[in-house]
Amino acid sequence: MEIESWWLLAIPLFFGLGWFAARLDLRSGGARPRGQLPEAYFRGLNFLLNEQPDKAIDAFVDVVRLDPETVELHFALGNLFRRRGETDRAIRVHLNLVERRDLDAQQREHALFELGQDYLKAGLLDRAEDAFNRLEGSRYAAAALHHRLELAQMVRDWPLAIGHAERLERDCGERHGRDIAHYRCEMAAAALAQGTPEGRAAARREIAAASAADPAHPRPPLLAGELALAEDDPAGAIAAWEPLVRESPSFLALAAGDWLAAHAAVGRFDAGLAALERVQAEHPAVDTFAAIADALARERGQEEALAWARAGLERQPSLLALERLLALHAPLADEARRGDIELMQRVVQPQARRLARYVCRHCGFKARQFYWQCPGCSRWDTYAPKRTEEIERG
């Protein structure tokens, strides 16, 4: 079994800890000859060099005594346990430090901060939150507040997350406008999903607050248009989305179908189509392609939609666009050709499904729907409004 790479970094650390342990032994008036290291240290180092990290740690634990001067050894071991995923052992080490009465305030705060990180990695969120809350007013307060913000996001407590983010802005001079806009939008989306007048009113307030937190963010106008449609106000939806055409045109792909439907509802389909085609020319997206083809089929008939889709496919070859073209072509084909088209659809569809996913640019998590926060790594704004095929094509 190959030694884990982080153990290569641990070896110099334990040489240093051995020197420290020898000094402690001398101070304590031990019977060993001057400069001799504790036997457990050599035993642990032997295990480490023989690629037996579990036994090595057990031996090094034997070196660590309750002498107040061995605090740094405790911290080193606890952090190594956590890095290896042995959160139970890390918790025991750091909890022991927190409960010791001979530590000064700074050492106890350090131990409490490490313990909070142990709990967080172990998924013990309530205990982690309690540990970080207890660091209020300490030198670890800012770092603990970052973890408290992380915890609030994990449990989707958006009002609490807003409070923590605003404190980081106020007390630490950090910028969290975009984060706060997302939290507000999450609250707006939940309120809108209620389908009630009260929910829509709450959504409107949160969307306005999100826009104030980050005026350049594309998410609030997208939600504002969705809210307008929920209130049967297509003109209001168009007004909400129009800034995207100028400021974040690629994100209009996420509302392309509704954009065209809203323009059709107010008798301005041609104007809406022309605007979306200009966006598509500069920022091609499969979702926009499909939205235009579907809207043309609905408003002007299958043949015009098919002609437009064929021309678009020639300009920008795409397997996903081909799948849409075949779907448009099938109803117009005679019975003999329809069988061939359906065969082509069966061949194309599996690969098209693979290419139709969105991809997180941070962790690579792939999803069939667009996410503002990646389900894999929990980071915000890591999905482009483009499918895998478009990203791979560059």
What do the predicted segments below correspond to?
Residues M1-G35, N133, G137, A142-H146, ...:
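Long, contiguous interaction/recruitment modules in multidomain scaffold/adaptor proteins
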Residues P33-E69, A76, R82-E86, R92, ...:
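Alpha-helical segment of the N-proximal tetratricopeptide repeat
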Residues P38, E72, Q106-H110, A143, ...:
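Start-of-helix register in tetratricopeptide repeats
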Residues R43, L77, L115, R148, ...:
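Structural register within alpha-helical repeat arrays
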Residues N46, L80, D118, L151, ...:
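Residue-level signature for tetratricopeptide repeat
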Residues N50, R84, A122, V155, ...:
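Structural motif corresponding to the intra-repeat A-B loop/turn of tetratricopeptide repeats
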Residues P68, D102, Q106, R139-Y140, ...:
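Short coil turns that delineate tetratricopeptide repeat
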